[in-house]
Amino acid sequence: MSRGIIIIGSGFAARQLVKNIRKQDAHVPLTLIAADSMDEYNKPDLSHVISQSQRADDLTRQLAGEFAEQFNLRLFPHTWVTDIDADAHVVKSQDKQWQYDKLVLTTGATAFVPPIAGRELMLTLNSQQEYRACETPLRDAQRVLIVGGGLIGSELAMDFCRAGKTVTLMDNAASLLASLMPPEVSSRLQHHLTDMGVHLLLKSQLQKLEKTEAGIRATLVSQHSIEVDAVIAATGLRPETALARRAGVAVNRGVCVDSYLQTSHPDIYAIGDCAEINGQVLPFLQPIQLSAMYLAKNLLGGNAPLKLPAMLVKVKTPELPLHLAGETQRRDLSWQITAESDGMIAKGMSGEGQLRAFVVSEDRMKEAFALLKTLSV
C-alpha cells in the first residue's frame, strides 16, 4: 500500500503544491504536518493590516478542516516535527511518527532579528500567528520604528504612516531597497515616503533597545536616540533549514535543491521560502507557484525540470507602487530613467545594450509586460 506524500508546512507553497497534485491525482495519500493552525491566509496582506484596521482573524480565508475536506487530506495542525529519518522514510514528532514515499519541506523562513541588547522588544510581522501575538501593541502604538528599509520595511512604513502613526524607518544602507536597486531608481519611493511624513534614518545602525516609562528608547551606534512605542524588525528572512540539516540534507542559505526541486536525498524535496534552487533563494509568489506546478508532476512520476521565466516582483506601496524585473541589483548596469508626473520607467542596460533589468512605477506599470518580453535573461 502506498504511504503517499508528506508535506511539512501549511503556507502558500504547501497549498499550491496540494492543488497541483490534486489536479493530476485525486487519490494519492497526502498528509500535511505543521506547527500552526493550518488555516489559510494571504501573507502579503500583512503589509496593509494597520491602515485597513484588520485584526489577525480577519485575514483567515479558509479553515483547515474545509481545506482537508476539499482536497482529501490528512492534516496534523499544531504539531512540531522534531526529526526526519531519511533512510527509513519516517517523519517524527514528540508523540507520533509517519511513513512516507516522498517528503516535501515547505518550512518557510523566519524573520531575522538583529542580535542587539533589547532584541526581545522587537516585533516581527512574518505570519498571521506573529501578527496575532502583537496586534494590540501595534494598533495602540503611535510612534513606530521600523528597522530595515527593504521591501517589507518600505511597505510597512507606508502602511503605518497611512494609519496616522509617526513612523521612523532605519537602515544601514544609504538608500531604500538597496539590495534590489541603485539609489537613483529607488529615490522616487524614498522622496514619496518622506513627503508622507516618514522620518528616514539611513546609514544608521541600531545599537540597543531599552524599556522606559514612556515606551522604548532606541539608541543608535552614533549614540543618537529616539523614543518610540513599538519597534518592528524588517531586516530580512532566513530560510528555515534546521529540520533539513538534522535529516542530513544539504543546506546552504536555504535547503539546496536542483531543477527538479529534489534535495541531496532522492525522496526529499523542498519548495517555497525555505528552498535554495540551484543557488538562488526566491521568496516571491510567482517562482513558488511555478515550483509547485513542476514538483507536483515530478512527485507523481514525471521528470520535469523547473524553468523560470523573467518574472515581476511587486512592491506593495499603494501610494507609489513599483514593479521590477531582471537583475536590478547588478551594479554594472547603465540606468536610463524617465520620470514624469504619472510614473517612472528605469531601464538597466548592459554594456552590450541589452535590457537586463527594469523598474516601473504608478501608471507606467502598464508597460511592465511589454518590457518583460524584451528582457534578456
From Swiss-Prot:
Disulfide bonds: none annotated. Its EC number is 1.18.1.-. InterPro entries: FAD-bd_OxRdtase (IPR050260), FAD/NAD-bd_sf (IPR036188), FAD/NAD-binding_dom (IPR023753), NO_rdtase_NorW (IPR023961), Rbx-bd (IPR041364). GO terms for molecular function: oxidoreductase activity, acting on iron-sulfur proteins as donors, NAD or NADP as acceptor. Its cofactor is FAD. The keyword NAD applies. GO terms for cellular component: cytoplasm. Keywords: Cytoplasm, FAD, Flavoprotein, NAD, Oxidoreductase. It catalyses: 2 reduced [nitric oxide reductase rubredoxin domain] + NAD(+) + H(+) = 2 oxidized [nitric oxide reductase rubredoxin domain] + NADH. It is found in: Cytoplasm. It is an enzyme of class 1 (oxidoreductase). Pathway: Nitrogen metabolism; nitric oxide reduction. Belongs to the FAD-dependent oxidoreductase family. This is Nitric oxide reductase FlRd-NAD(+) reductase. It comes from Salmonella typhi. The gene is norW.
